[in-house]
Amino acid sequence: MQNTNTLNWINKLIYLSISIPIFFLILVTTYPNSVEAYPVFAQQAYKSPREATGRIVCANCHLAKKTVDIEVPQAVLPNTVFEAVVKIPYDMQLKQVLANGKKGNLNVAAVLILPEGFELAPPDRISPDIKEKIGNLSFQSYSPDQKNILVVGPVPGKKYSEITFPILSPDPSINKQTNFLKYPIYVGGNRGRGQIYLDGSKSNNTIYSSSAEGQVVKIIRKEKGGYEIFIDTIDGRKITDIIPPGPEIIVSEGEFVKVDQPLTNNPNVGGFGQANTEIVLQNPLRMEGLILFFISVILAQVFLVLKKKQFEKVQIAEMNF
């Protein structure tokens, strides 16, 4: 009976020696030290690309909603270079309406909002592997005093539907404004041209609607593209709606239209999306402590196994005796 109890006690020790480090690993990698814890055009009109509501301002001009994804490491050490990969997916076969009304390939652009202290990695710190992924992309800060906000584009979408940002993490021992914490990262990405200009006027990449209720009496296709639609309103006025090159009309002469009724199709095939993720700025001292802890656990397990074998030998000797 005593031998059985001793064996049970040894088995429990071995179980604890395995389960404790696993729990400790989850705790260290999940939580930081403390629980406290568009692009180019947007620069001209907005001090910050992210509104208080969390909405990224690029959505003010790019009205259609699309998806965007971001991939970053779960945790990084201070003063290290890592990749932030922004994915802007779309159908590569699509063609968009260009400013002259003709069809062309889509461009993409992105804005990456990093935590304070994180910034674009200097060229001499970027590895050849990351440089190859970057290609000929040129990144810039949103403003001279906002180095943690990076913008890129517009660039050809067929080549850069995945954009790799080389990021340098801060060192809290040097930058006292940063801490070993879990931080949020925000990203916005668009494909294709916008529907609204900064001054509020429409581009030719959107729907054009009737400005009055009445009858379409005449439609003229202009020599350089676009249309003039003449409408006799119900109150006797005569108005002309101008359609720029690009959208195609969906009304015909003699048709009655209401106010804000679409006169054209929607030529837009692009759109804007935003996403967010988190990253932990990990304290290297914690990692060193974790390694030492694992070494001590492994040694403890070895000693437990040796002790168990020694006990079994004694038990066999007693049985033979």
Swiss-Prot record:
Kindly list the biological process annotations in GO that this record carries.
Answer: photosynthesis
What's an example GO cellular component term for this entry? chloroplast thylakoid membrane
Q: Does the keyword Ribonucleoprotein apply?
A: no
Write down the membrane topology. Answer: Single-pass membrane protein
What residues does heme bind to? Y38, C58, C61, H62
Determine the domain of life of the protein's source: Eukaryota
As for what it does, the entry says: Component of the cytochrome b6-f complex, which mediates electron transfer between photosystem II (PSII) and photosystem I (PSI), cyclic electron flow around PSI, and state transitions.
Name the protein family. Belongs to the cytochrome f family.
Q: What is this protein's record name?
A: Cytochrome f
Source organism:
Chara vulgaris (Common stonewort)
